[in-house]
């Protein structure tokens, strides 16, 4: 416990809140270049081959980003747009790639939740 005199001299220091998406540097999204596209397996009760990519962002930081939806056209040197948002069963994956922007195509034959996957409205 500090004395009154110590508080007068130094004062209290505010706690600094740590952001969950540090690599975006305060931006809502950031552009980047894929350095590696691969699959990885999720944590214990789940089983799958989740599609992820290592992305070098314009902020200079390299992050692992999840590729949502079924099927993708990404490969090394693809330009992608990255947003925040973790994948609960993939440790260390705290970003997601935005489908339908830059070099990333939208999901084919997507009928519902199309805006999340960059899918165009089907011609009726």
Swiss-Prot record:
GO terms for cellular component: small ribosomal subunit. InterPro entries: NA-bd_OB-fold, Ribosomal_uS12, Ribosomal_uS12_bac. It comes from the Bacteria. The modification 3-methylthioaspartic acid is found at residue 89. GO terms for molecular function: rRNA binding; structural constituent of ribosome; tRNA binding. Keywords: Methylation, Ribonucleoprotein, Ribosomal protein, RNA-binding, rRNA-binding, tRNA-binding. The keyword rRNA-binding applies. Residues 1-30, 102-124 are annotated as: Disordered. The keyword rRNA-binding applies. GO terms for biological process: translation. Residues 108-118 have a biased composition (Basic residues). With S4 and S5 plays an important role in translational accuracy. Interacts with and stabilizes bases of the 16S rRNA that are involved in tRNA selection in the A site and with the mRNA backbone. Located at the interface of the 30S and 50S subunits, it traverses the body of the 30S subunit contacting proteins on the other side and probably holding the rRNA structure together. The combined cluster of proteins S8, S12 and S17 appears to hold together the shoulder and platform of the 30S subunit. Belongs to the universal ribosomal protein uS12 family. Part of the 30S ribosomal subunit. Contacts proteins S8 and S17. May interact with IF1 in the 30S initiation complex. This is Small ribosomal subunit protein uS12. It comes from Saccharopolyspora erythraea (strain ATCC 11635 / DSM 40517 / JCM 4748 / NBRC 13426 / NCIMB 8594 / NRRL 2338). The lineage of its organism: Bacteria, Bacillati, Actinomycetota, Actinomycetes, Pseudonocardiales.
């Amino acid at each position: 416990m500090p004395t009154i005199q110590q508080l007068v001299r130094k004062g209290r220091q505010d706690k600094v809140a740590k952001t969950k998406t540090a690599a975006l540097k305060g931006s809502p999204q950031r552009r980047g270049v894929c350095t590696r596209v691969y699959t990885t397996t999720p944590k214990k009760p789940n089983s799958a081959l989740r599609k992820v990519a290592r992305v070098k962002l314009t902020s200079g930081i390299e992050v692992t980003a999840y590729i949502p939806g079924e099927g993708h056209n990404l490969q090394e040197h693809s330009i992608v747009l990255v947003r925040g948002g973790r994948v609960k069963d993939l440790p260390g994956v705290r970003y997601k790639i935005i489908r339908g922007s830059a070099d990333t195509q939208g999901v084919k034959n997507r009928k519902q939740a199309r805006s999340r996957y960059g899918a165009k409205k089907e011609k009726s």
